[in-house]
Design a protein with these regions (language model features):
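Multi-pass alpha-helical transmembrane bundle typical of ion/small-solute transporters
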Residues: 1-294
Length: 294
């Protein structure tokens, strides 16, 4: 997790930190085909998000992710922070939506739909292939290999999570500390690892048991598929959700056994939380910023 953020998290950091809200007059003119309002220098001093906006975006995202985690919902840090940054951008510009990078936001939103579907399809195919191979192999020998493979794939999931979620968590801070990206990545990775160890068990139970039962080969297929999908999007600088990818992959494994083996109600409730999270985070961040700054 820490290594993923430190070595390959910069693309997502740049997108979250500087690619969602337009704070530069030149970028505004190029994006909107018109000169920016004269108040842009008041909205975004020094051509960046104000410090209050950065803090409120982070607090808003952290609040919604914490509440969801406590409620056992695997929501997306990516969605929460993107919503938070967009919200403070709208609040800082006095509700002028032209300061949002609409094209970037649409691309991000599209990736939130594609990512779990891609992971689901990959997991479905990989689990089906593993099933064929296991039927032709000695059970005892393959059991040991699968156990080791699950541990390795779990490490890959953590690495991929770091490449994306660390960038999400600290992306807004590069507005304030553009020369401290390695240190911020290390801090973000350590903080996420600490949160996973101390507060992640509730969500782990939901994903691992309440969607569909997983054996070793199912866990391997789900982990590899989710990690691969997230890693690709991270390299492209698109903030997607590891949670969404993992849930999609677990559903893919379940579908190989038939639709009845997937907890439909739980999947629907999780999907609803994915819609609520960015909207709520954006609304809260926007309102909080206007309240704080008047």
């Amino acid at each position: 997790m820490v290594l993923g953020g430190a070595f390959q998290g910069q693309n997502v950091m740049e997108t979250v930190g500087k690619g969602i809200v337009i704070t530069d007059p030149v970028v505004y003119a190029a994006t909107n085909g018109a000169d920016p309002p004269s108040a842009i220098k008041d909205y975004f001093p020094d051509g960046r998000l104000p410090d209050q906006a950065i803090l409120i975006a982070l607090v808003s995202a952290g609040l919604f992710v914490t509440l969801a985690t406590y409620s056992r919902f695997p929501v997306s840090t990516s969605q929460a922070i993107v919503g938070g940054v967009a919200g403070v951008g709208v609040g800082a510009s006095h509700f002028d939506f032209s300061f949002l990078q609409t094209t970037v936001l649409l691309r991000i939103a599209g990736s939130w739909i594609i990512s779990p579907i891609l992971a689901m399809l990959l997991a479905f195919g990989l689990y089906w292939l593993l099933g064929i191979l296991l039927r032709r192999a000695r059970a005892v020998a393959w059991s040991n290999v699968l156990r080791a493979s699950v541990m390795v794939s779990a490490a890959y999931v953590s690495f991929s999570l770091g490449t994306n979620d660390v960038g999400n968590a600290i992306g807004p801070l590069i507005n304030r500390f553009p020369d401290r990206i390695p240190e911020l990545a290390l801090l973000g990775g350590l903080a996420i690892a600490f949160g996973a160890l101390t507060f992640g068990r509730r969500v782990t139970h939901t994903v691992g048991r309440e969607i569909t039962p997983l054996d070793y080969s199912g866990a391997l297929a789900a982990q590899v598929s989710a990690a691969l999908g997230v890693h690709v999007f991270s390299l492209l600088g698109i903030p997607v959700s590891t949670s969404q990818a993992v849930v999609g992959a677990v559903v893919g494994v379940g579908l190989t056994k038939g639709a009845q083996s997937v907890g439909g109600r739980k999947v629907v409730s999780i999907a609803v939380s994915w819609v609520i999270t960015p909207v709520s985070s954006a609304a809260f961040a926007c309102g909080a910023y206007r309240l704080v700054t008047g």
